[in-house]
Amino acid sequence: MESYFPATFFFCRCLKYMSDYTNCLLQGYGVLPSAPTKVRVPHIDVEFAIIDWDTPNTLADTVQHYNIHYRKMATYDNEYHTIPKVHSPFILEHLSSNSDYEVYVEAVNSHGVGEPSARVVFRTENKVRNTVMCN
């Protein structure tokens, strides 16, 4: 009797990459938007930042919404958090003060998710500000 465990095990491990594989194929067909351009952080505060970007150079007219991915740097989990279905400008809230964050944006159309934008790193403001004491 033949064992199907190895093939099934490896197949299941690959399932989590299927959306990436599909997006790669669709990029080749030219139906996905290119990466959003000029991602910037024009305003940074203690617990929030405003993220802004321009439309993709390719297939911008097909974009339905954007996904923002962000993570706090120098932490143990270093996992990206995703906020789907947003538009520019976007207020990224509930951040920690005096912390470094990395953010990137993806454009989404009816065919799938396009290439990610360039990553942008920023630091939130410090909650405790230095004050000068006058005598």
Where are the regions that the model predicts?
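Extracellular low-complexity, O-glycosylation-prone stalks/linkers
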Residues: 1, 11-93, 100-135
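Short hydrophobic targeting helices and cationic amphipathic motifs
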Residues: 5-6
